[in-house]
Amino acid sequence: MARYRCCRSQSRSRCCRPRRRCRRRRRRSCRARRRATRCCRRRYRLRSRRY
């Protein structure tokens, strides 16, 4: 769940895509975020009700 969420403060689109603003949370997830784009979208689809 929090795996691909390196940029918590940013919007989901920014969180999924590799951005420079993701400095605070620099984990493996941040690096894997490039591939996580699909995963992120997929996960947010299930939570689309919230957003």
From Swiss-Prot:
It holds the Pfam family Protamine_P1. It comes from the Eukaryota. Its main location: nucleus. Keywords: Chromosome, Developmental protein, Differentiation, DNA condensation, DNA-binding, Nucleosome core, Nucleus, Spermatogenesis. GO terms for molecular function: DNA binding. It is found in: Nucleus; Chromosome. Testis. InterPro entries: Protamine_P1. PROSITE patterns: PROTAMINE_P1. GO terms for biological process: chromosome condensation; sperm DNA condensation. GO terms for cellular component: nucleosome; nucleus. Belongs to the protamine P1 family. Protamines substitute for histones in the chromatin of sperm during the haploid phase of spermatogenesis. They compact sperm DNA into a highly condensed, stable and inactive complex. This is Sperm protamine P1. The gene is PRM1.
